[in-house]
Amino acid sequence: MFTPQSISQRSNGLHFKRPVTYKTTMLHPVMSVSSRSSQEESLMTVGESVSSLSMQEQQTESDTDASHSDNEENDNVDSVSNFDNLSNSIHLISLNEVDELLEDHQSTIQSSLNRGLTCTNLPDHSIKSGVTRSTVSTVRPTSKQHHQPYKYRSLLLPFEPSRGSRSMRRKIGGSRGSSLASVRRIFRSTHHLQPHKDLNSLPHEIMSKIVSHLDQRDVTMCLYVNKNMYSTAVRQLYKEPFFSSTYRFAQFVTQVSHNDELASYVQKLDLSTIRPGFESDEDDSAIFENEPIEDDAVLAGWRDWKLRGDPLYSRQFKRLTKHVSNSSSSLSCSRTSSNSNSSTESKPVKKRRSVTTAIRESRIWLSFYKKNKLYQASEEVLEALRKQNSPLVRPKVPFSTAHPISSPFLRQYSTSKDVPVGHLIHVVAACKNLTDIDISFLPLAEDYAVAGSSSYLPTASSGLLFVSDVAKLYTWKPDEIVPVSPSDLVVAMLQLRDLQVLKLRKLMWVKRDSVVRLVNENNSLVHLDLTDSGLVRGARWAIAGSVEELRQTLK
């Protein structure tokens, strides 16, 4: 018996013919051809040629096999005879013949490719002791070089990527180009979910930094934007307030002395910019004489704010008295005209005509304004307002009203810009975060503190009450008031723990004792300006410098 191993050893390069299956596939079904029948006919011819060649080669191969086995004839005569019988039944062929058959079949495949047909899975042949599988891959006829036959056939098979690898290559190749588009798509999809960014979303510190670069007029306009801007603008306005008159400063004192939150915002107090109520290049004696002066030329001062509730000193009372005087004069004229001649009777008639003419003109102007105004209310809005019985109220606009005008009874104080000592003590006692104070060129008006025995009670948060706070015109009793001096203001400044800069230039009420207390008792003070201050001109301590320099000067 012969085992397969002995048969393979005795083959010596012979190739066994095994049953073969052929398959044909079409890469691109470009035309409908009966390829199945044609392929079967071509494969039948190939099989017959292979079998005929194997019969012719049988004799030559058996002779070569006998020549190689001369040394083993004595031992294996029976095995050779049996092997010859087996080879005759198996039909052996050589490798050269197989290569020629493959080349012929390759040309047949190329001709079939030209017709749009492809052939795959050619028969597998075992070569010698090893097994090698050779398959003819289908090549897509995309160019002319694929149709030209090659002179030498390569042992390396061409790589044809599968459908999965092609899709992966497209994904990898297109990932670079589509990465930016995908990021944009994700951003657009999530952008509508993010809240809209505006000034209200900024932190309070950033908003304060932005508003700090605006002037006072622009900061005042920010009060009318919204609540968030209002809170930021209020902090900035009270942080470094600016005063143009003593009337505005009196309003500020009333606010901070009754509101601790607003008082905590104040860090810098500058009163050196305050101007008098009346400024004229000519002689100021015209104010005290009977020369006519326009009412709008004199601005109100702190005394007008103090007496704002008194109808005698308020502007409303003045307008009321002016209207009453005009009506009484017209009545007296009408009474006298009834007892006079016809020439005098024509005067009130002319006045009535002028009044009716003015009324008629005003009505015409009103109708013209309603017809041509820019914004007209709809009928629904007007109907809703009629049902509510509420008048149309125009919103307040900043800087729409001018500075208040001084009362004619207080015109004698219009050239002065003095400030009562009680007002300054109120501010220093309420604003505990002050770091910079400048009251240069500011004269102080004498003031009195109201004692507890009086019927007036303090309303300020500090518990202080001064005569400058009470609208009282009659004389105070001696036991109801206590005089207040500038030295009391210095004592109040000593309580400020954050005060660093103090400017007291050209102030006659500054004394050496007050300067000594400021330098020695206030530890936070860094800079002090006393230029041209004091009753004595050219005093040694009336200089501007650091606290250490003033200490050396005062020794």
UniProtKB/Swiss-Prot annotation:
Residues 196-246 form the F-box domain. Keywords: Ubl conjugation pathway. Signal peptide: none annotated. SUPFAM superfamilies: F-box domain. InterPro entries: F-box-like_dom_sf (IPR036047), F-box_dom (IPR001810). Residues 31-82, 124-147, 327-354 are annotated as: Disordered. Residues 48-61 have a biased composition (Polar residues). F-box protein probably involved in ubiquitin conjugation pathway. This is F-box protein COS111. The lineage of its organism: Eukaryota, Fungi, Dikarya, Ascomycota, Saccharomycotina. The gene is COS111.
